[in-house]
Amino acid sequence: MNILYICHRFPFPPKRGGKIRPFNMIRHLSASGHRVTVCSLARSAAEAEEGQGIAAHCERFAMGIVSEPVQTLRMVARLPLTTPSSMGYFHSPALQRQVDHLLQAEKWDLIFVHCSSVAQYVERVRTVPKILDFGDMDSQKW
């Protein structure tokens, strides 16, 4: 299968809970013979550089680099809207462009979304099956 895997934290290196689970899923899917493309956010140039190691575990990856001040402003801008403010926090126009390009450029068998906050990147896609892993769903947030 050709799988587009979208997650809210860049999954490499796998040294925290928000990275370990998606990393292991990506590694398993790739080892099982699936073509996996990872799309995610990096919070700094250093994290983006460190994250390059994911290339050994997937076919390719795309990332958007975001910063805390910009993420916070995007989150606050969404407060008067009916959509969750966390969608603003996890939105990257650069990553959205990359995801859109990937979706148009090739045929996908599955879109796997790890965490609800990044489902926005593929919410308009109707022609590809999607799995949404609510790994971020807990009573303290919702």
Language-model features, listed with the residues they occupy:
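Short loop/helix-cap segments at secondary-structure boundaries that form the rim of catalytic
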Residues: 51-55, 121-127
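Redox-cofactor binding/interface segments in oxidoreductases and associated redox assembly factors
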Residues: 5, 113, 132
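Conserved nucleotide-sugar donor-binding subdomain of glycosyltransferases
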Residues: 67, 72-125
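N-terminal subdomain of nucleotide-sugar transferases
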Residues: 1-62, 104-106
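Structural motif
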Residues: 2, 109-110, 129
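Short, solvent-exposed loop/turn segments at secondary-structure junctions
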Residues: 10-11, 43-45, 68-69, 116-119, ...
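Active-site proximal beta-strand in glycosyltransferases
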Residues: 126-142
